[in-house]
Amino acid sequence: MQKQAELYRGKAKTVYSTENPDLLVLEFRNDTSAGDGARIEQFDRKGMVNNKFNHFIMSKLADAGIPTQMEALLSDTECLVKKLDMVPVECVVRNRAAGSLVKRLGIEEGIELNPPLFDLFLKNDEMHDPMVNESYCETFGWVSKENLARMQELTFKANDVLKKLFDDAGLILVDFKLEFGLYKGEVVLGDEFSPDGSRLWDKETLDKMDKDRFRQSLGGLIEAYEAVAHRLGVKLD
């Protein structure tokens, strides 16, 4: 399957059309951003690591019965995916307090959240992805009540699968975001799962093994991503 026209260029990925109107090529670039794109740097191997990491995770979720857009790994930095009608709202699950939750509520970083929190955010960089709720989604027509309920169900199911996967690898799944779309009327998991859109801490040291290393200028971003991949058994080379 060959990529054709560039359809969309995001902060770290580019989407291309193919000869099949139902399929797209997703290219992972080496770009890394923070502050809604205000700060951007490039890191060698990042596109490759995230592409193979994402394919690995999507395969695990598909094995658990979660419908995903993933079709095939095409190259080190490209994968073939179903074309989805994306929902403009992203889902976030929080197993521990971190990031914006700590700032918003003034709570201690790292405390366990039981049951996990479920948040919704409107995908809009200019407005810094404002938090919304089910009522907003219904009133503004972003997603139907039924499809939103399905998104929440799949997000919590993914959390159950991934918490165990990372725990077995000596990592804490602190939080993560998922994006969904519709494929022939069905709610399907899209976009990506990688250390770019999740928080992962070492169980013993609580070292941050995700994009917070870039956000907080801790250094060692790619080394952390590759370490996580190796612990999970992701084949990078």
UniProtKB/Swiss-Prot annotation:
This is Phosphoribosylaminoimidazole-succinocarboxamide synthase. It is an enzyme of class 6 (ligase). Its EC number is 6.3.2.6. InterPro entries: SAICAR_synt/ADE2_N, SAICAR_synt_PurC, SAICAR_synth, SAICAR_synthetase, SAICAR_synthetase_CS. The gene is purC. Belongs to the SAICAR synthetase family. The lineage of its organism: Bacteria, Pseudomonadati, Pseudomonadota, Gammaproteobacteria, Enterobacterales. Pathway: Purine metabolism; IMP biosynthesis via de novo pathway; 5-amino-1-(5-phospho-D-ribosyl)imidazole-4-carboxamide from 5-amino-1-(5-phospho-D-ribosyl)imidazole-4-carboxylate: step 1/2. HAMAP family: SAICAR_synth. Keywords: ATP-binding, Ligase, Nucleotide-binding, Purine biosynthesis. GO terms for molecular function: ATP binding; phosphoribosylaminoimidazolesuccinocarboxamide synthase activity. One of its GO terms (biological process) is cobalamin biosynthetic process. It holds the Pfam family SAICAR_synt. It comes from the Bacteria. One of its GO terms (cellular component) is cytosol. It catalyses: 5-amino-1-(5-phospho-D-ribosyl)imidazole-4-carboxylate + L-aspartate + ATP = (2S)-2-[5-amino-1-(5-phospho-beta-D-ribosyl)imidazole-4-carboxamido]succinate + ADP + phosphate + 2 H(+). CDD domains: SAICAR_synt_PurC.
